[in-house]
Structures are given as structure tokens and as C-alpha cells.
Regions:
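Core segments of alpha-helical transmembrane spans in multipass integral membrane proteins
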Residues: 16-22, 40-62, 75-82
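Membrane-interface helix-boundary motifs at transmembrane edges
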Residues: 1-3, 62-69, 95-97, 123
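Membrane-helix boundary connector in multi-pass membrane proteins
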Residues: 63, 85-102, 120-121
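Membrane-helix boundary elements
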Residues: 3-6, 14-41
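Non-cytosolic membrane-interface motifs at loop->transmembrane helix junctions
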Residues: 33-41, 70-71, 96-106
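Residues within membrane-spanning alpha-helices of integral membrane proteins
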Residues: 7, 11-14, 48-51, 73, ...
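Membrane-embedded alpha-helical segments of multi-pass transporters/permeases
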Residues: 22, 59, 88, 112-116
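Membrane-water interface at the C-terminal end of transmembrane alpha helices
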Residues: 109-123
Length: 123
């Protein structure tokens, strides 16, 4: 495994989440134990497009980052750790749960560790 592969894996996972938010918001939110109101669906669609943009960035970073590649890996490690913390907080507060929340919690933790470890190896 290398940092380029971690970016690509993260990009594919982001595409899955982005498409889920954009086209299957009701199901996506129901799986997180949230009531899918029209307003939440609208925010979810906007967030879905944003996540799709992040997926595109994650896919392209290995090809365009140059000397900053390792630093960007470390930055993404921090970002995934932040997502892990906010998802964990929402689960603990009872604001999210179900398969969506727990699977994403595990995925964010794994990706944070992989980004950190692989970016250190790339230095």
C-alpha cells in the first residue's frame, strides 16, 4: 500500500457517500437514524455535490501534488480525524446512529491512520 492508493481508496468511498447524499438522501439519512425532511434532503444534496468534488480532488492529488504530496497526505489525515471526531460526537449525543454513522466512523478512523502512516513513509 502507498499514499497514492490511499488517496484513490478515499476518493472512491467519497464518490459512494456523495452519490448517496445526492440521489438517495432519504435512504442515506434513514440509515443514520435521521428524519429526512425536505430541508435536510436539500442540505444533503448540496453536501453530496461537495463530497463529490472532494472525491475528485482526492483522486487527482497524487497526479498533481508534486513535492507537496506527503504534506497533503498529512493534511487529509487531520481532516479524516476531524470527521471521525464529529461523527463520534454525534453518535454519543444520539443525533446519529445506525449503519451509516457506525460504518463511516470506522472508515474515517482507518483512513486517518492510513493517510498518516503512508504520508510519513512518503517523506
Amino acid at each position: 500500500m502507498n499514499l497514492k492508493l490511499v488517496f484513490r481508496i478515499a476518493g472512491v468511498i467519497a464518490v459512494i457517500n456523495g452519490l448517496g447524499l445526492l440521489f438517495m438522501g432519504t435512504t442515506f439519512f434513514a440509515m443514520a437514524n435521521m428524519t429526512a425532511t425536505p430541508n435536510l434532503i436539500t442540505v444533503g444534496q448540496f453536501t453530496g455535490v461537495t463530497v463529490l468534488f472532494l472525491a475528485l480532488l482526492q483522486w487527482r492529488i497524487p497526479d498533481i501534488a508534486g513535492d507537496a504530496f506527503s504534506s497533503l497526505g498529512q493534511l487529509f489525515a487531520i481532516g479524516y480525524a476531524m470527521w471521525f471526531l464529529i461523527i463520534g460526537f454525534h453518535i454519543m449525543m444520539g443525533q446519529a446512529g445506525g449503519a451509516t454513522a457506525y460504518v463511516n466512523l470506522v472508515v474515517e478512523a482507518i483512513l486517518a491512520v492510513l493517510f498518516y502512516m503512508q504520508s510519513k513513509k512518503s517523506e
